From Swiss-Prot:
Modified residues (N5-methylglutamine): 250
InterPro entries per UniProt: PCRF (IPR005139), Pep_chain_release_fac_I (IPR000352), Pep_chain_release_fac_I_sf (IPR045853), PrfB (IPR004374)
Pfam family, one: RF-1
Location in or out of the cell: Cytoplasm
Protein name, entry field: Peptide chain release factor 2
Cytoplasm as UniProt keyword: yes
Species of the source: Aquifex aeolicus (strain VF5)
Gene (UniProt): prfB
Post-translational modification: Methylated by PrmC. Methylation increases the termination efficiency of RF2.
GO molecular function, one term: translation release factor activity, codon specific
Main location per the UniProt record: cytoplasm
Length: 373
């Protein structure tokens, strides 16, 4: 029985690996690796340090993906050969193969996840904004807890988190924060986090220890490259400088060079107060504005598309995507995919890959169903 079952598993692994190879294309990755090596060998490579870092990160991602594909190919081939030569009575070898299959499945699952990241902007860095909802200090503490969750997730991914703007609460937590998450496919992984996150718990700020419900809104945007043209006219901008303010502590870098930019036609406002010079803050704020304007254009196109399709969507800033219940029981549930876990401590410490994976699979399935209709 074990032999028949494991043979079937090895055949399934081969099929899944071939599907992954069709999408990720080892040949294209090999070609891209050569191009990236060529870029890195150019004399002026380090002139733009930000772009140089992006090239290095991309090269690391391509090389790791290629190595995983090569190792998987070897492992599956070895398993296929072992299946053919192992007798049914050799239970020790079958047991060893069972463990090897589990290991191959783990790596294959990682690569399958990458196949869902094929959107035009998925490979980009991501701007992540968290805004506390109504509810005073409790809501601000919840926003801060989410901020820590995403920072821990990014650390585990090897991503860099650059603070762009933050407004601390007077008592605890934060009213809002914007960061730039830098790393390959940061936007692709994080895009499904956009929406409203709801917390239910006994509030540590309530002397009567009552249960409170708090909300925080998460917004995710791709960082826009210079080669993507978003027209921003100087006459459409209102630029103000101000002194960074807040409750002090770890978040606030006191400076007279903070910059706030308002895009007059749309009313979009962005600010940056973390850099030491006004020029740097202005540059970072303009980059963020560009991302917001791009997101606005994409939203308009999406709405137009929905009109043509005759569909209505409830996805938006006010859409609740996930609930985090800490009391009277412990459960975190994604309201779109149905994925849930009772291990709230791990999730709040950045273990959100299962939620990200379930969203990407759910979205791919929805798109497949839509294209078939």
């Amino acid at each position: 029985m074990m032999m028949v079952e494991l043979k079937g598993k090895v055949e399934e692994l081969r099929k899944r690996l071939e599907d992954v190879k069709k999408i990720l294309s080892p040949e294209k990755l090999e070609s891209e690796l050569k191009e990236l090596d060529q870029k890195m060998s150019e004399p002026n490579f380090w002139e733009d340090q930000e772009k140089a870092k992006q090239v290095i990160q991309r090269r690391k991602w391509v090389e790791e993906t290629l190595n995983k594909l090569k190792n998987l190919e070897k492992s599956v081939k070895d398993l296929e050969e072992l299946v053919e030569i192992t007798s049914e009575e050799d239970t020790e070898t079958w047991a060893m193969m069972d463990e090897e299959i589990k290991e191959v499945e783990r790596t294959l699952r990682e690569l399958e996840l990458k196949t869902y990241l094929s959107g035009e902007m998925d490979a980009k860095n991501a701007y992540l904004t968290i805004q506390a909802g109504a509810g005073g200090t409790e809501a601000c503490d919840w926003a801060d807890m989410l901020f820590r969750m995403y920072k821990r997730w990014a650390e585990k991914k090897g991503y860099e988190v650059e603070l762009i703007d933050i407004t601390p609460d007077d008592v605890a937590g934060i009213k809002s924060v914007t960061v730039l998450v830098k790393g390959p496919y940061a936007y692709g992984y994080l895009k499904g986090e956009q929406g409203v996150h709801r917390l239910v718990r006994i509030s540590p700020f309530d002397a009567n220890a009552r249960r409170h419900t708090s909300f925080a809104a998460v917004s995710v945007m791709p960082q826009i490259d210079e080669d993507i043209k978003i027209e921003i006219k100087p006459e459409d901008l209102k630029i103000e400088t101000f002194r960074a303010s807040g409750a002090g502590g770890q978040y606030v870098n006191k400076t007279d060079t903070a910059v706030r930019i308002t895009h007059i036609p749309t009313g979009i406002t962005v600010s940056c107060q973390q850099e030491r010079s006004q020029y740097q803050n202005k540059r970072k704020a303009l980059e963020l504005l560009k991302a917001k304007l791009y997101q606005l254009e994409m939203k308009k196109l999406e709405e137009k598309k929905k009109q043509y399709e005759g569909e209505k969507t409830d996805i938006g800033w006010g859409h609740q995507i996930r609930s985090y219940v800490f009391h009277p029981y412990k459960l975190i549930k994604d309201l779109r995919t149905g994925y849930e876990t009772g291990n709230v401590e791990a999730v709040m410490d950045g273990e959100i890959d299962e939620f990200i994976e379930s969203y990407l699979k759910w979205k791919a399935q929805k798109e497949k169903e839509s294209s078939n209709n």
